[in-house]
From Swiss-Prot:
UniProt-annotated binding residues for ATP: 55-63, 78
Catalytic function, reaction form: L-seryl-[protein] + ATP = O-phospho-L-seryl-[protein] + ADP + H(+); L-threonyl-[protein] + ATP = O-phospho-L-threonyl-[protein] + ADP + H(+)
Protein known as: Serine/threonine-protein kinase US3 homolog
Chain ranges of the Protein kinase domain: 49-334
Claim: Nucleotide-binding is one of the keywords in the record: yes
Organism of provenance: Cercopithecine herpesvirus 9 (strain DHV)
Annotated family: Belongs to the protein kinase superfamily. Ser/Thr protein kinase family.
PTM field: Phosphorylated by UL13 homolog; this phosphorylation regulates subsequent phosphorylation of UL31 and UL34 homologs by US3. Autophosphorylated.
Pfam families: Pkinase (PF00069)
Function text: Multifunctional serine/threonine kinase that plays a role in several processes including egress of virus particles from the nucleus, modulation of the actin cytoskeleton and inhibition of apoptosis. Phosphorylates UL31 and UL34 homologs, two critical regulators of capsid budding from nucleus to endoplasmic reticulum, thereby facilitating virion egress. Modulates and redistributes host components of the nuclear envelope, including LMNA, emerin/EMD and the nuclear matrix protein MATR3. Phosphorylates envelope glycoprotein B (gB), probably to direct it to the cell surface.
UniProt-annotated catalytic positions: 162 (proton acceptor)
Subcellular location: Host cytoplasm; Host nucleus
Length: 345
């Protein structure tokens, strides 16, 4: 199917659900968002799709659950007006891996770039929300898929920069993919850290990215560690702001990570020019000995194989985090079936 023709059609049809999503926004902002969403939807319908559902608007634009009118295939269409959507399309056209979201096609409409993507049953965030706990083998199967995706990206000089539960799509624990490449950075020098700009999500970003220090592929390893922790605790958040932290910003987030980990001054990255070293090393006081279990492990009773993996991935110094390839060789993954069976079969 060719999705590459420009569409020149407009209408004013709109899901009423989006009004509920925007209930807390300023009235003028809501009106503008509704108008822009209606334009995106009109272009999608002109391109030969029927919109089934409008998802909550994101930073890059709008996402719709759709059905292709001729084939009756269920798809997801992302419609964005920012550079991240174009970047995502370019990256997805040039990569191919079983656990990375597949780009089925693209089209443009007015100022929108639209990506046609396969539809999965849910994302990992909602998957965890629907369950009180999941089996360790399921967690490790999902994490293995995420690490395989990250390994492939890093080998192709791409840093995802926004690995999180909301960007991991799942049909079942053996059918998982990493998506949403709007924050991705390429091409990168995987052998040398550099500041590629701010991107991602504060709650899941690595300390060096939060500090605006030079960074590299290890930022994805940190975020994947947060994902594994959330699976192990079934949605608990390790480094979310608490009642004492006020508004969540990078400075507060770094201090929260340092406090909850109990980072010893000797565990800071050895770089006199780095913000983490220059500003935060001197403010940290801890009785924890360097190289011992992080302070947060005292609050959770995690299986040792999961705790060990998470601690390795959440090393405060990026140079101490293993690569995705190295992590996949850890003993925790040895007994996980590959391919992982579909529990409904």
């Amino acid at each position: 199917m060719n999705y590459d023709d420009d569409c020149l059609y407009e209408d004013k049809h709109m899901d009423t659900d989006i009004y509920d999503m925007l209930a807390d926004e300023d009235t003028s902002d809501v009106d503008n968002t509704l108008a822009v969403c209606a334009t995106a939807r009109a272009g999608i319908e002109k391109a030969g799709f029927s919109v089934l559902e409008t998802f909550t608007p994101g930073a890059e634009g709008f996402t719709f659950a759709c059905i292709e009118n001729k084939t009756r295939e269920n798809v997801v269409i992302k419609a964005g007006q920012r550079g991240g959507t174009v970047t995502e399309a370019h990256i997805l056209r040039n990569i191919n891996h079983p656990v990375i979201i597949r780009l089925m096609g693209t089209f443009t409409y007015n100022s929108f770039t639209c990506l046609v993507l396969p539809r999965y049953k849910t994302d990992l965030y909602c998957y965890l929300s629907d369950r009180r706990r999941i089996a360790i083998c399921d967690m490790l199967s999902i994490e293995r898929s995420v690490l395989r995706a990250i390994q492939y990206l890093h080998e192709n000089r791409i840093i995802h920069r926004d690995v999180k539960a909301e960007n991991i799509f799942i049909n079942h624990p053996g059918d998982v993919c990493l998506g949403d490449f709007g924050a991705a950075c390429y091409p990168v020098d995987i052998t040398q850290n550099k500041y590629y700009g701010w991107a991602g999500t504060i709650a899941t970003n690595a300390p060096e990215l939060l500090a605006r220090d030079p960074y590299g592929p290890a930022v994805d390893i940190w975020s994947a560690g947060i994902v594994l922790f959330e699976m192990a605790t079934c949605h608990d958040s390790l480094f979310e702001k608490d009642g004492l932290d006020g508004d969540c910003d990078s400075d507060r987030q770094i201090k929260l990570i340092i406090r909850r980990t109990g980072v010893h001054p000797s565990e800071f990255p050895i770089d006199a020019q780095a913000t983490l070293d220059e500003i935060y090393r001197t403010c940290q006081k801890t009785s924890r000995k360097p190289g011992t279990r992080p302070t947060w492990t005292n609050l959770y009773e995690l299986p040792l194989e999961l705790e060990y993996l998470i601690c390795k991935m959440l090393a405060f110094d990026a140079h101490k985090r293993p690569s995705a390839k190295a992590l996949l060789d850890f003993a925790a993954f040895y007994d996980i079936p590959d391919p992982y069976p579909n529990p409904t079969n």
